[in-house]
Amino acid sequence: MVFGKLKKNDITNRYYAFSSFPGEIKEFYDKQLDSEIHTISYNNYQIPSMLEYHLKPLKPSISINGPDYHPVIFEYWYQDIELTGQDLYILQKNSNELQRISKDCEDYSLLKKFLTKRDNSIISEFYLYSCKQFSGEIRKLPTLLF
């Protein structure tokens, strides 16, 4: 019961921000996407974490970090995964980041836009893109050396 109280009084939208993942996004992934293709997110570690938690994809979801973003554990967990030359799905919360990573794709197209709502108000938008033949130029791993 405590969670219900917290969720109802959540002024940060923390409990709502990814509420489209177990429903609409999971359904789209299950019915429309190729499970053999990795999903990446640029400069965002939360999206791959939520995909792993809610969708449990066959191929791991990965955060790709640019030089302007702090290193995250994905860089070390998956540094051996070769993405260069592969087709990928890109899921982003901010459409501005998509412009940065689109340069690394031979072909780039919007598959679907997902809306997350709270009480009929949109609190976040997620953009799912298809990236053909990822060049890998943006992925310089690891960005933090021990």
Give the positions of each predicted feature.
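Short periplasmic/luminal acceptor-recognition loop of GT-C membrane glycosyltransferases, typified by
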Residues: 7, 11-71
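Aromatic/acidic, Gly/Pro-rich catalytic loop(s) in extracytoplasmic/lumenal soluble domains
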Residues: 29, 69-146
